[in-house]
């Protein structure tokens, strides 16, 4: 049994707290006083995990130092736009003998950096920084539905985190040394998931969904290889695994956003209707689109979602344009 500190009390942060508290001492940093009072008295937050009672052994705090101090493993689980601030907040308290894990699936909307790159640019010292990702709806994982994820980072440390945080038979962790690939797969699948929601909203059928997932994976692979990631990672849990579950399920915020876009709504209105809960694909779309444009990477689905989100492109016209592109080989390049 070790001490685990979790920075962030959204759906995924609370789900991880519920899982890891079965084996370890878990302390969760909560951003707002109102959420802290709710969680510390009722051990639930239906805005994120509806009808799920959290383990009473979980400790909640509004003091970030209290969550970080004495924690062998510190896990940041915030939206990507708040990740840099989370790193700034924990920097005075975290030390080289601790392990930092990012469980945020996104890219920095201003710089396009992965979360581990953001962390390394802010936190001084030489501590190990890893990434946790994979097909994992918070609502299911918190209930104990069998879930498998991957932790990416240096070999010895990722193996230690794998062995320490796995909670059989509910939560299985694999490890990978391709941290960049693990991060990219987890971030870019959110873009394709928005498209998946549009497909669902328009009731286009299984043929269209299969084509989207397959061609979407091609785009993720092109992007990942340009960043130095390994292609085999894209065929693992953080790649195709997360892509399938996020594109196919209404539990995904990104998928739900796409369904609402198909009704003619603007993404800002959808986020407001959902208590401000973030669809990470919005930020990932901006970062990936701009990177692809600068580096001449062929990502037509990403470009289409960018134009729908930010240029008010007509969805039916955009779909017609995608399906009318010049014929080409099926290969990645």
UniProtKB/Swiss-Prot annotation:
Keyword Coiled coil among UniProt keywords: no
Gene3D superfamilies, per the entry: N-(1-d-carboxylethyl)-l-norvaline Dehydrogenase, domain 2, NAD(P)-binding Rossmann-like Domain
Residues noted as binding sn-glycerol 3-phosphate in the record, renumbered to the chain: 105, 134, 136, 189, 242, 252-254
GO cellular component labels: cytosol
Gene Ontology biological process terms, A to Z: carbohydrate metabolic process; glycerol-3-phosphate biosynthetic process; glycerol-3-phosphate catabolic process; glycerophospholipid metabolic process; phospholipid biosynthetic process
InterPro entries: 6-PGluconate_DH-like_C_sf, 6PGD_dom2, G3P_DH_NAD-dep, G3P_DH_NAD-dep_C, G3P_DH_NAD-dep_N, NAD(P)-bd_dom_sf
Catalytic activity: sn-glycerol 3-phosphate + NAD(+) = dihydroxyacetone phosphate + NADH + H(+); sn-glycerol 3-phosphate + NADP(+) = dihydroxyacetone phosphate + NADPH + H(+)
PROSITE patterns the UniProt entry points to: NAD_G3PDH
Location (main, coarse): cytoplasm
Protein's cellular compartments: Cytoplasm
Residue numbers annotated as active site: 189 (proton acceptor)
Annotated keywords: Cytoplasm, Lipid biosynthesis, Lipid metabolism, NAD, NADP, Nucleotide-binding, Oxidoreductase, Phospholipid biosynthesis, Phospholipid metabolism
Residues binding NADPH: 12, 31, 105, 138, 253, 278, 280
PANTHER family: GLYCEROL-3-PHOSPHATE DEHYDROGENASE, GLYCEROL-3-PHOSPHATE DEHYDROGENASE [NAD(+)] 2, CHLOROPLASTIC
Function text: Catalyzes the reduction of the glycolytic intermediate dihydroxyacetone phosphate (DHAP) to sn-glycerol 3-phosphate (G3P), the key precursor for phospholipid synthesis.
Protein name, entry field: Glycerol-3-phosphate dehydrogenase [NAD(P)+]
